[in-house]
Amino acid sequence: MLSRVVLSAAATAAPSLKNAAFLGPGVLQATRTFHTGQPHLVPVPPLPEYGGKVRYGLIPEEFFQFLYPKTGVTGPYVLGTGLILYALSKEIYVISAETFTALSVLGVMVYGIKKYGPFVADFADKLNEQKLAQLEEAKQASIQHIQNAIDTEKSQQALVQKRHYLFDVQRNNIAMALEVTYRERLYRVYKEVKNRLDYHISVQNMMRRKEQEHMINWVEKHVVQSISTQQEKETIAKCIADLKLLAKKAQAQPVM
């Protein structure tokens, strides 16, 4: 419990110690930089979250465990009592008024620790839990951010792996565009050739018609020119005779 209180007090006072100036001889200089060398790339064992067990708020449990095999269960207490009596008998430590003051202060401290220690420990634990929660939240946010970056990178890699499909689509689109252009030009050539052929056919038909008309006119002209006056009179007389004969036949037929 005392160790947690000391650690909380040290964590609270650390920012002020970092910003402190040179205070004087015998005082810790917080601005001094330690461990300036390159860090070692070896696995560092994690620090324990809680300190070791202690007895009477001061003596570590390991001390008793070390003496138990050699002195028994009561050995540490006998050793401590013997050391105190030895110091008093040899006047290494002399009892004075300050001794009673120290005992009174120690009793008050023990009473305060026993009564208010759990509340202070709970308060320190709550502060520690809040800090751990903030650190855990930051850790989870960082993990989520890194996971999102990994997912984005994977999606980008998947797109890169599938880019040949895009190239194939573009290649097919270009081939289709070239095919459409080729068909359009081929149709344009077909229409142009057809128009020219139609033009030549029209010209040939017109020339053939003109030749026929010219031939008919030429033949008719020469036939008319070849008829003499006597032949014309005979032809006219024969036509008149034929008409008279037809008229007589028409009159001779009874009317139905």
Curated annotation (Swiss-Prot):
The keyword Transit peptide applies. The modification N6-succinyllysine is found at K131. The modification N6-acetyllysine is found at K139, K154, K162, K221, K233, K244. Residues 1-42 form a transit peptide. Its main location: mitochondrion. GO terms for biological process: proton motive force-driven ATP synthesis; proton motive force-driven mitochondrial ATP synthesis; substantia nigra development. SUPFAM superfamilies: ATP synthase B chain-like (SSF161060). Keywords: Acetylation, CF(0), Hydrogen ion transport, Ion transport, Membrane, Mitochondrion, Mitochondrion inner membrane, Transit peptide, Transport. It comes from the Eukaryota. Gene3D superfamilies: 1.20.5.2210. Subunit b, of the mitochondrial membrane ATP synthase complex (F(1)F(0) ATP synthase or Complex V) that produces ATP from ADP in the presence of a proton gradient across the membrane which is generated by electron transport complexes of the respiratory chain. ATP synthase complex consist of a soluble F(1) head domain - the catalytic core - and a membrane F(1) domain - the membrane proton channel. These two domains are linked by a central stalk rotating inside the F(1) region and a stationary peripheral stalk. This is ATP synthase peripheral stalk subunit b, mitochondrial.
